[in-house]
Amino acid sequence: MTDLFERAASGEEVRVDYTAIERTLADMWRADGVDEQHTVTRAALWNVVAHTLTPQHHAYASETLSKAAAAVPQRTIIVRADPDAEAELSSWISANCHIGGDGKRVCSEEIAIVAGGTRVTRVPPLVNALLIPDMPVALWWVGDLPHENAEYVHTLLDPADRLIVDSVHFNDPADLAIVKRVADDTGTAPADLNWIRLEEWRTATASVFDPPEMRDKLRTLKRVQIAANVQDETYFGERIESLFFASWLMAQSGAEIDVTFDLRRSDRRGLIRVELELADSKATIERDHDRCVLSTNIDGRISVPDAVTRSQLKNIDELIVRVLKQPGSDRLLPKILPVTLQLAQQMK
């Protein structure tokens, strides 16, 4: 194995000229020992591009996608682009490796690009040139979407099959509006990690209407109270999970619902309790943090839904793996986004 590969696989970021990235990657894999001993497998199923603004976000994205690559091998391209920084365009390569089931190392490539000032405009064509052909592309936008520079976002999205965001970091409804426009006007399918976190709550809530006597009562849903823990109740992104849940209920019931929100300051972020008022019934879904379960209470009958045996908050890398392993796009998220935007305007 080449010295270049061993340096890259050890976690070292090897600096290269951005015009020679592909050539250097080819050199990294070119070694007699690879073919003769088959000790390392080069693997990729996705191109995953992470866009960041700060060094902290860059390091976070690198660590997260390194973990995700063990489950979904990928060519990782991490971009740090700051138009307000000094003009620069630099690049590095490294390798993410793990031990496969046969005991051999499975490795995928990571490319880091740092752009500042006017050279940020070179990022989209450079990224496009580095994508492995005939392989799906996911763009993970780390942090807040720059709604004031939507054209730059859409340029990066041109080759992307998926846009991955985490709306808990959005500071304005205009960020959600960008996601809606992506869903409506492009071939890129949006995926929101904040929406995926709600899956257990949606499953538990749907179980309320599983009993035969409850199946027709969804249409009688009149009032909903949603209680959630937030770290800062004034920050827009902290409210989106509750807004998503309310929008989903409205979409499923097909009726106007009176929704109230109870946001409580806590370090343990997320929904904690939902109360549903039906025509002649009441139901609650509640998180038990100590037991890590969601329980339902329908007119005094308490149960833990079979489909939600343990309620665990997933790590970001696990949520991203979930998106990459999903065979198709999420059809429900685009459906609820218009409702979410309406509710967001009402909460202002």
Language-model features and meaning:
Residues 245, 253-254, 266-270, 277-348:
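Long, compositionally biased intrinsically disordered terminal regions
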Residues 109-210, 222-223, 227:
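Internal, hydrophobic cores of structured domains that mediate oligomerization or house catalytic pockets
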Residues 67-78, 132-137, 158-164, 184-189, ...:
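Structural alpha-beta junctions
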Residues 56-59, 231-236, 279-287:
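Short, surface-exposed beta-strand/loop "edge" segments at domain boundaries and coil↔beta transitions
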Residues 54-57, 119-120, 144-147, 170-171, ...:
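Gly/Ser/Thr-rich loops at beta-strand to alpha-helix junctions
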Residues 1-140:
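An N-terminal, globular interaction/scaffold subdomain
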Residues 194-259:
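ATP/pyrophosphate-binding catalytic subdomain of soluble kinases
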Residues 124, 260-265:
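Conserved short internal alpha-helix adjacent to the catalytic or cofactor-binding core
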